[in-house]
């Protein structure tokens, strides 16, 4: 286990990992090994990916997406809660403990960690999908101060009960609340690809142009938007990468380029 006395006053790292690889035991074990070794201790935010859709279908509902975000009716919310707060959270916590870390699974509902309002989207109604409005950073700092890695499931508390939250947006909100040095969004690609090449840096204006021309599309859009939101809220850097590049590779989202870049 991590020594609870080990404390570092530097800002920590917030890592968001997507759900589509979290049913791969080898990936989960390697992720846990890398995350457990990071100092200062990081915060991990996870998705649920295809496991949510599979369970949703088992419950008799067909998954659908609006603008890259999961439409969440009552059945979809039940599936998301069961997968995110249940099987995926337990799997990640078990892997981190096996890797020598101390970890605790927590959702955005627990202790009112993440508060949300219903998210509006120009592409249509999203159902019970929330937009983060507040994060109780002190809850996470207390865990970190005691040597515990928080593993956050993005089910959050709205004015009328639980809401599903896009994990990228949840990670951006958590990163902003903690004032972290960097938010890292782990995907199944090595970064934002333009004509097959990983872009080392991208600015807001470049991202908007690449979204407009279709180069950035689908599930990558919420990731780059969350990265920009994290920057707007004061996070020093936001990076999109894969597991192999978690520590220092991928695409770093910046406010603007220096003149020599």
Swiss-Prot record:
Its EC number is 2.7.2.8. The keyword Transferase applies. Keywords: Amino-acid biosynthesis, Arginine biosynthesis, ATP-binding, Cytoplasm, Kinase, Nucleotide-binding, Transferase. One of its GO terms (biological process) is L-arginine biosynthetic process. Substrate binds at residues 48-49, 70, 164. Its main location: cytoplasm. It comes from the Bacteria. NCBIfam families: argB (TIGR00761). Belongs to the acetylglutamate kinase family. ArgB subfamily. HAMAP family: ArgB (MF_00082). PANTHER family: N-ACETYLGLUTAMATE SYNTHASE, N-ACETYLGLUTAMATE SYNTHASE, MITOCHONDRIAL. This is Acetylglutamate kinase. It comes from Roseiflexus sp. (strain RS-1). The gene is argB.
């Amino acid at each position: 286990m991590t020594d609870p006395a080990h404390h570092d006053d530097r800002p920590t790292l917030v890592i968001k990992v997507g759900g589509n690889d979290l049913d791969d035991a080898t990936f989960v074990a390697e992720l846990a090994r890398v995350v457990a070794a990071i100092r200062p201790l990081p915060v991990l935010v996870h998705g649920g990916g295809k496991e949510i859709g599979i369970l949703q279908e088992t419950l008799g509902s067909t998954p659908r997406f609006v603008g890259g975000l999961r439409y969440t009716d009552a059945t979809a919310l039940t599936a998301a809660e069961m997968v995110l707060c249940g099987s995926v959270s337990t799997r990640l916590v078990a892997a981190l403990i096996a890797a020598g870390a101390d970890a605790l699974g927590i959702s955005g509902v627990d202790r009112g960690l993440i508060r949300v309002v219903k998210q509006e989207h120009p592409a249509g109604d999203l159902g019970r999908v929330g937009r983060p409005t507040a994060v109780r950073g002190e809850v996470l700092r207390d865990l970190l101060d005691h040597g515990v890695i928080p593993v956050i499931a993005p089910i959050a508390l709205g004015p009328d009960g639980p809401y599903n939250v896009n994990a990228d947006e949840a990670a951006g909100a958590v990163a902003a609340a903690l004032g972290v040095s960097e938010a890292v969004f782990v995907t199944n690609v090595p970064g934002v690809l333009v004509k097959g090449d990983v872009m080392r840096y991208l600015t807001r204006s470049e991202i908007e142009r690449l979204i407009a021309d279709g180069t950035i599309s689908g599930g990558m859009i919420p990731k780059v938007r969350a990265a920009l939101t994290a920057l707007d809220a004061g996070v020093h850097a936001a990076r999109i990468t894969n597991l192999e590049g978690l520590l220092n590779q991928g695409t770093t989202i910046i406010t603007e380029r220096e003149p020599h870049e």
